[in-house]
């Protein structure tokens, strides 16, 4: 038992979060002691009560907390006496307190030991069993020893922080989708949790194979159904997410390992948990953003499989009339199941700004915050305000604050209406300068076509999306059809196709790349120049697709040096000759440019001018590389800021050099459509802004209400700032003076 005890302590100590540590503890104690129930009650001395924080065997109700006063129940008695209590039949003890919601009436044997550190009671550790018996001395000694070890791992500061969640009223988080929402918080009690699945075996593997097969089929049908549903509307980005889910679900290796686990004697639920977690951990251990997000996708798949394995979850859910979803994690499938006419906001404990769930809430226009460090159960059925602009969550707000946010929501609705009135007008400054508003495309062609009259062309088409949704490299013919559709859709406007940009944040399932530091590794143009056959096939497809329209711009991603540009141009010229030989006539020459996202190229602009026709500044990666920060890492995401003075000075230098050397300058990335950044970019000299479709209306509204001189003045003052907060204060004041403060916060 000593070895087992050491293993449990090491696993608990290495858990990244207290809740995870407690779940590991109760699970491993049940396995080690061969007992049916293990629970941890932690003491909140401010409220003089215990919280049931983790259990295996009892029914811990979703969406609310289970508490016991210090003077209640046998658990309370263990704490008051500060010594173990070992009972053969706990229900006959005068201190026994029945709690219907946890379903413990089946269990008779009870052993509870206090968790004490430096004379301070931290909690009570309990095991229970149906059998009428006292736990023997070795079992009691084992549990007492574990409680002592737990006391050393736990600290009062940890518990104070944990229980502080129940009293928090304002919680900082990451803004994931703009907007303001007010409603009751709601945790979905029907969603199965992976941590609630425990190891269990079966004597009928054939039955478990049948159950697993059924769950896989149900999930596949579900993903196809959601894909068709969203494809039928304007949400093509969302449809593409479910296509990717279907692709992951059909992975041969994943299915093989699931059935292998069942064949070893595991029940289907345990097979799903072990295999999905193994795959997800492999992805999560890698450092690049895209692979980390795929770990979340795999867990979402696992959750859906567990859902379809549980017959009890197949009934309808009683959603409130208006609610804000609160969850530990969020999947696109969960969002798709929710009644869209009732869902007004989302709060997620874990999540990245570029996860599929984040993409989807932005596409649906649902105000969302992620990285809110609070348990969802604490927020269930409480009045919440989600501020997706500031990245704030307000819990049980005072009436005055509630009234103020309700006013902001009304004004936000009016502002959206005003912006839509301008969307079909040209993006022209008050001083007369014409700004080109371009579209970042690649996920939703039908929706993009609807924006055709509102934009000046496609500033960035992400060609990697079709590559990611297939089980192998698309053929040249398939690519021709794909690109032809986009070039013809906007045949009177420039269309910029970016060559394959994979690696690091975007991986192909059939071309896995494992590196210690993938963000600085084999990605973008580095891959396609090392694999010229991939590059040549893609460029030939682009040139063939452009033969009839002549509006093609080719964009090279992740360029680090001039020799990469030279080699890429050489291959493009070769592809052009091959296409002309194939079709027998001369084809239009495309314009060739680079995505400026690596800091080294900022200093090479005079030499680039002789090699490229245009430059498109990719602000997302350029910000990350200049600041050396991963914006999807919640620990450092607050450092990521495109308005950092160093970033602004880099943008100013790029604009200045581009003007001197006559380079056609463009900008894409989140800055291009961010109302907090647009005026500064205009003042710095940027005239081509490429943004996501949802940003077009508000960007045009802003542009038509400023003139160049005042934008230039704002940009110059921002360049003199020393901190990003100074810049933001300047922009906020600038916007408020012009009656456009509502574009950067709630309200008008």
Curated annotation (Swiss-Prot):
TM regions (residue ranges): none
Region (PTS EI): 171-748
Active site: 356, 668
Annotated compartments: Cytoplasm
Reported cofactor(s): Mg(2+)
Xref: Pfam families: GAF, PEP-utilisers_N, PEP-utilizers, PEP-utilizers_C
Cofactor binding notes: Mn(2+) allows activity only at low concentrations. In the presence of low concentrations of Co(2+) or Ni(2+), activity could be measured, but at concentrations above 0.2 mM, strong inhibition is observed.
Record keywords: Cytoplasm, Kinase, Magnesium, Metal-binding, Phosphotransferase system, Sugar transport, Transferase, Transport
Gene3D superfamilies: 3.30.450.40, Phosphoenolpyruvate-binding domains, Phosphohistidine domain, PtsI, HPr-binding domain
GO BP term, pick one: N-acetylglucosamine transport
One cellular-component annotation, GO: cytoplasm
InterPro entries found in the cross-reference section: GAF (IPR003018), GAF-like_dom_sf (IPR029016), PEP-util_enz_mobile_dom (IPR008279), PEP-utilizing_PTS_enzyme (IPR050499), PEP_util_AS (IPR018274), PEP_util_C (IPR000121), PEP_util_CS (IPR023151), Phosphohistidine_dom_sf (IPR036637)
Binding site for Mg(2+): 597, 621
EC class of the enzyme, as a word: transferase
EC number: 2.7.3.9
Domain spans labelled GAF: 1-127
pH dependence: Optimum pH is 8.
Similarity annotation: Belongs to the PEP-utilizing enzyme family.
Protein's job: Component of the phosphoenolpyruvate-dependent nitrogen-metabolic phosphotransferase system (nitrogen-metabolic PTS), that seems to be involved in regulating nitrogen metabolism. Enzyme I-Ntr transfers the phosphoryl group from phosphoenolpyruvate (PEP) to the phosphoryl carrier protein (NPr). Could function in the transcriptional regulation of sigma-54 dependent operons in conjunction with the NPr (PtsO) and EIIA-Ntr (PtsN) proteins. Enzyme I-Ntr is specific for NPr.
Miscellaneous information on this protein: The reaction takes place in three steps, mediated by a phosphocarrier histidine residue located on the surface of the central domain. The two first partial reactions are catalyzed at an active site located on the N-terminal domain, and the third partial reaction is catalyzed at an active site located on the C-terminal domain. For catalytic turnover, the central domain swivels from the concave surface of the N-terminal domain to that of the C-terminal domain.
Description of its domains: The EI N-terminal domain contains the HPr binding site, the central domain the pyrophosphate/phosphate carrier histidine, and the C-terminal domain the pyruvate binding site. The GAF domain is an important site of signal perception in prokaryotes and eukaryotes.
UniProt name for this protein: Phosphoenolpyruvate-dependent phosphotransferase system
Species assigned in the record: Escherichia coli (strain K12)
